[in-house]
């Protein structure tokens, strides 16, 4: 079974840049997209044959949102955190299959001045972990998406200069550590424990992508 995940930073813009061709090439069983920035009715698209589309869009127009495309039979679809915390931003979308749950997640960004860090640390991260454990009591859980945190120094190019930068604060890293302590596995780091320079996000400034000055903030 093949699962893929991508923060598209706007599904409408990404459709114009070849999203459908990419989906066709990947031939994944399930495609999880984050930061869709659109409602279903705003997107005029015919998805590749065999895929069913499940949306969780933000109430605020053009903001956040998740989308899961699946070719596998889906038993149920759940939006949000099951009542543990209000999700008006379309950040969590859970699809249930015969033998596991798949949780597509776009974790809130703490913001440049860390104004959302208290919410992230005290409310979101604990509620998300509790939600996952509640699901896990029923059947195995796979979760993926943009978690907006580089967990360890190896997961970003410049850890020393970013210790109080959003995405690498001790509070955000602790939230991820709690997921690991609860038994969830960072798949990439488990397979490649010492491999540095592997990132999923680069700033648009200072030619960062060409120089590979990046962060690994997206996970399975």
What are these regions (language model features)?
Residues 1-47, 58, 63-64, 178:
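N-terminal, active-site-proximal structural segment of metallo-dependent hydrolase catalytic domains
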Residues 20-24, 91-98, 127-139:
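Short amphipathic alpha-helices and their capping/turn segments at secondary-structure boundaries
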Residues 30, 50-52, 124-219:
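Metal-dependent phosphoesterases centered on the DNase I-like endonuclease/exonuclease/phosphatase
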Residues 1-9, 99-114, 144:
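Active-site-proximal beta-strand elements of phosphoester/diester hydrolases
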Residues 37, 42-112:
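Structured beta-strand-rich core segments of catalytic domains in phosphoester-bond hydrolases
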Residues 16-17, 89, 173:
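Structural motif corresponding to alpha-helix initiation and N-cap regions
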Residues 82-83, 108-125, 160-165:
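Surface-exposed cleft-lining segments at the edges of enzyme active sites
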Residues 9, 37, 108, 148-150, ...:
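Catalytic metal-binding/acid-base residues of hydrolase active sites
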């Amino acid at each position: 079974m093949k699962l893929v995940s991508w923060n598209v930073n706007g599904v409408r813009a990404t459709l114009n840049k070849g999203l459908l061709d990419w989906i066709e090439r990947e031939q994944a069983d399930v495609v999880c997209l984050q930061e869709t920035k659109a409602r279903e009715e705003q997107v005029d698209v015919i998805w590749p044959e065999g895929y069913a589309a499940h949306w969780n869009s933000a109430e605020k127009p053009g903001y956040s949102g998740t989308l899961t495309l699946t070719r596998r039979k889906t038993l149920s679809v759940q939006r949000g955190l099951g009542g543990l915390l209000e999700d008006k931003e379309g950040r969590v979308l859970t699809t249930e299959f015969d033998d596991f749950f798949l949780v597509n997640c776009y974790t809130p960004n703490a913001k440049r001045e860390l104004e959302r860090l208290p919410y992230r640390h005290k409310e979101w991260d604990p509620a998300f972990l509790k939600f996952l454990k509640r699901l896990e009591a029923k059947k195995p859980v796979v979760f993926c998406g943009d978690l907006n945190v580089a967990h360890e120094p190896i997961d970003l190019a410049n850890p020393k200069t970013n210790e109080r930068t959003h995405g690498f604060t001790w509070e955000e890293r602790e939230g991820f550590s709690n997921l690991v302590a609860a038994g969830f596995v960072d798949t990439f780091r488990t397979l490649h424990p010492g491999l540095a320079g592997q990132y999923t996000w680069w700033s648009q400034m200072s030619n960062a992508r060409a120089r590979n000055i990046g962060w690994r903030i997206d996970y399975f």
